[in-house]
Regions:
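A charged, aromatic-enriched C-terminal amphipathic alpha-helix characteristic of glycosyltransferases
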Residues: 149-179
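Conserved acidic donor-binding segment of nucleotide-sugar-dependent glycosyltransferases
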Residues: 122-123, 127-134, 143-148
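A conserved mid-protein helix/loop that constitutes part of the nucleotide-sugar donor-binding site
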Residues: 1, 10-24, 135
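Nucleotide-activated donor-binding/catalytic signature segment of Leloir-type glycosyltransferases, i.e.
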Residues: 48-69
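Short hydrophobic beta-strand element within catalytic cores of glycosyltransferases
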Residues: 84, 103, 107-110
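A structural motif in glycosyltransferase catalytic domains
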Residues: 3, 18-21, 36, 137, ...
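Short acidic alpha-helix that forms the nucleotide-activated donor recognition element
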Residues: 68-80, 103, 121
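Short alpha-helical segment that forms part of, or immediately flanks, the ligand-binding pocket
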Residues: 74, 96-103, 114-118
Length: 182
C-alpha cells in the first residue's frame, strides 16, 4: 500500500507521528507491505531531525516537491492509496491539499483538527484520528494495509467531492449574471 504526505514538512503537520507510526508498523512485521512518501518543503531547523528519522526507515522516502501546477503532478499523486494528514498546526485553515487529494482520488487519514471535519467526511473521503495520537494513526494505517478499509470506494467518493470545487461547476453563467459580470 502506498501512503503519501503532501504539505510543509514540520513536526506540527504530524511528520514525526507518521515516522513513528511507520516504525511501529515495521516492528510488527508490516515493513514490506507499505511505503510512505513525503513531498514538500522541509521547515527550517527540522531538516536534520527529519532526515535522521526517515533514513532509519527502509519504506519511508523524501521525494522532494510535487508540481501540482501540471497534470503530471496529479497523475503522480493518483498513484497513492491514502494520504496522511495528522496535523496539529495552529495555523491550519482550509488545507488546499484536500482539493488535491479529491482531484487525485486519494482519501486520507486526518486528525480531528481545525476545519478538517467540515471539509472531509469520515468513512467517505477520510478516516479520522484524534490529534496527537500515534497509536490511532498506526492502527488506521494498519487497517488500510490489511484491507479492512474499502479504499477504492473512498477514492470514488473523493473524485465525486472534487466536482464541488471544479471551477466549471462553481462559476456558472447564472452566478456571473447575478454578480453582474455578464
Amino acid at each position: 500500500l502506498r501512503f503519501v504526505f503532501l504539505s510543509r514538512i514540520m513536526p506540527e503537520k504530524g511528520c514525526d507521528y507518521i515516522l513513528e507510526a511507520t516504525r511501529l508498523l515495521n516492528e510488527e512485521g508490516y515493513e514490506k507491505r507499505f511505503t510512505v512518501d513525503f513531498y514538500g518543503k522541509i521547515a527550517d531547523g527540522y531538516s536534520c531531525a527529519f532526515n535522521e528519522k526517515i533514513n532509519s526507515l527502509k519504506n519511508a522516502t523524501y521525494q522532494g516537491f510535487l508540481n501540482l501546477r501540471e497534470k503530471e503532478g496529479y497523475d503522480q499523486l493518483s498513484n497513492y492509496d491514502m494520504m496522511l494528514f495528522p496535523t496539529y498546526w495552529r495555523g491550519e485553515g482550509f488545507a488546499g491539499v484536500f482539493i488535491d487529494a479529491f482531484i487525485s482520488g486519494v482519501p486520507m487519514i486526518a486528525t480531528d483538527w481545525a476545519h478538517n471535519r467540515i471539509i472531509l467526511e469520515d468513512g467517505k473521503t477520510a478516516l479520522f484520528i484524534p490529534t496527537h495520537n500515534v497509536l490511532a494513526l498506526k492502527e488506521k494505517m494498519r487497517q488500510c494495509i490489511s484491507g479492512d478499509v474499502d479504499i477504492q470506494r473512498m477514492s470514488c467518493c473523493c473524485q465525486n467531492e472534487a466536482q464541488k470545487y471544479d471551477v466549471n461547476h462553481v462559476i456558472t453563467e447564472e452566478l456571473l449574471k447575478r454578480i453582474e459580470v455578464m
